[in-house]
Amino acid sequence: MTICGRGLRRAVGASPRPTWRRALSDTRGRLKPEYDAVVVGAGHNGLVAAAYLQRFGVNTAVFERRHVIGGAAVTEEIVPGFKFSRASYLLSLLRPQIYSELELKKHGLRLHLRNPYSFTPMLEEGTGGKVPRSLLLGTDMVENQKQIAQFSKKDAQAFPKYEAFMDRLALAIDPLLDSAPVDLEAFQRGSLLQRLKSLSTLKPLWQAGCILGAQLPQYYQVLTAPAAKVLDQWFESEPLKATLATDAVIGAMTNPYIPGSGYVLLHHVMGSLEGVRGAWGYVQGGMGALSDAIASSATAHGVSIFTEKTVAKVQVSSGGRVQGVVLQDGSEVRSKVVLSNASPQITFLKLTPQEWLPEEFVARIAQLDTKSPVTKINVAVNRLPDFLAAPNTPGDQPLPHHQCSIHLNCEDTLLVHQAFEDTLDGLPSKRPLIELCIPSSLDPTLAPPGCHVVSLFTQYTPYTLAGGKAWDEQQRNTYADRVFDCIEAYAPGFKGSVVGRDILTPPDLERVFGLPGGNIFHCAMSLDQLYFARPVPLHSSYCSPLRGLYLCGSGAHPGGGVMGAAGRNAAHVVFRDLRSM
């Protein structure tokens, strides 16, 4: 398209320099030999931890391996003129305290809330000249019921009750997200005083129990049962169940029929944006703009952030206490504490001298489940996708469904199950599960006029292909072509609109973003790796066996997603420990 070409030329190089980088180069750009605290990795959790520590009066520096901050919450211009949220792509789970306490709106964060938020087109022949059916869900419950009634009037009546049921569970779990887990080590091995102090960590559990009350057994089932079993108890129509089940498997090497998948379902419905519970939205300028806002808040209070500065090793004193880090260029930076936003595996198996860690602890970290089904494909297109189930208007302007998470190959939970089964044999799914998002439908700054960016979160793809083969360029392109063929069936003309793409298989996600196995949560969000077992039992309160070394990333409680809770909670624990030194 001509209009797209003109806009593309204007867009190249038009991105302004982030506020945090301007402030840092003006006042705090020189590396000092010593800080109170060092944060390894400028992912969103690391930036949050640094921002809080600096506010507490702890002089903090952040070292980032890449040329850009944000970790997986990053905006990158892979195709000239098109700005992609290259890894994470939606916002909802960010804790409201972080939004307000770090004054992120003041530091440039702008959000586009999505309503409606979910669109599931059917792959079927329209009858009587009508278009194929689809399921469109948003915040209007009456309209939701009308949509669901196309498939089941019984389900339409049950849906508000289901939403209320899940909202109550999310409300109960809320206090657990904003505090360290129960300190089992203090209970088991601490002094009497430490045991008494650790009793305070039981308060969030008590609060959760009070909210759930007599319905606790039903809610326990949600956390432990297969998501399909939970959904079958509420609904009968497959399009609705399959749409809801996508939240149970997103980013997880599981399927709706595996026990424990119900928890991941909850993990993705317990967020809020600007006071609207369960809302999801796009960040103006892409997810990197969120990281820039956190960094701006941090540097405004004195945090120093250094990009392209890889931490090679955690330094330990002869007395067995952290005393700083060594950078890849050989520079030594001393500090009282080190917080790692890297995964538990990188932190404890690569950066930390093994002689300072108990063998049992190292073995547990090495055994963490990091399997990932995800291949993320970022696509630049020169026109809006045109779905058979919801045709575009003549002006080609975005319609309500274009702002949604668009669920493809999602008419039936058995399709999700079959996609999972394929990958057990080392094969990418024949009919992959696809979540398609078009953030430029609400944020035109992401692409040249007339063009759009499309995010494809797809599964299931194995880390290693059948026969022990590694992914190569041909395999990547073959899989991406398969995904595009699937989209073409729902939206003819999609393949012809593509002007560029960026394919990230599980090994690519690991290489680029440091996600072990390509796992977006650092390690699986299964019940055996949650709360006081995250990352491992007895070391779930952000502390490690090595004094002065802390975990503050998604591998710590409460887990993955762009939440920031691990960074905030870890900062409070570190500040408490520093005061007692």
Curated annotation (Swiss-Prot):
Organism from which the protein derives: Bos taurus (Bovine)
Name used for this protein in its record: Pyridine nucleotide-disulfide oxidoreductase domain-containing protein 2
Subunit and interaction comment: Interacts with COX5B; this interaction may contribute to localize PYROXD2 to the inner face of the inner mitochondrial membrane.
InterPro entries the UniProt entry points to: Amino_oxidase, FAD/NAD-bd_sf
GO molecular function: oxidoreductase activity
Enzyme class of the recorded protein, top EC level: oxidoreductase
Enzyme nomenclature, EC number: 1.-.-.-
High-level lineage: Eukaryota, Metazoa, Chordata, Craniata, Vertebrata
The family this protein is said to belong to: Belongs to the carotenoid/retinoid oxidoreductase family.
Pfam families, per database record: Amino_oxidase
UniProt-annotated location(s): Mitochondrion matrix
Chain's role: Probable oxidoreductase that may play a role as regulator of mitochondrial function.
UniProt KW keywords: FAD, Flavoprotein, Mitochondrion, Oxidoreductase
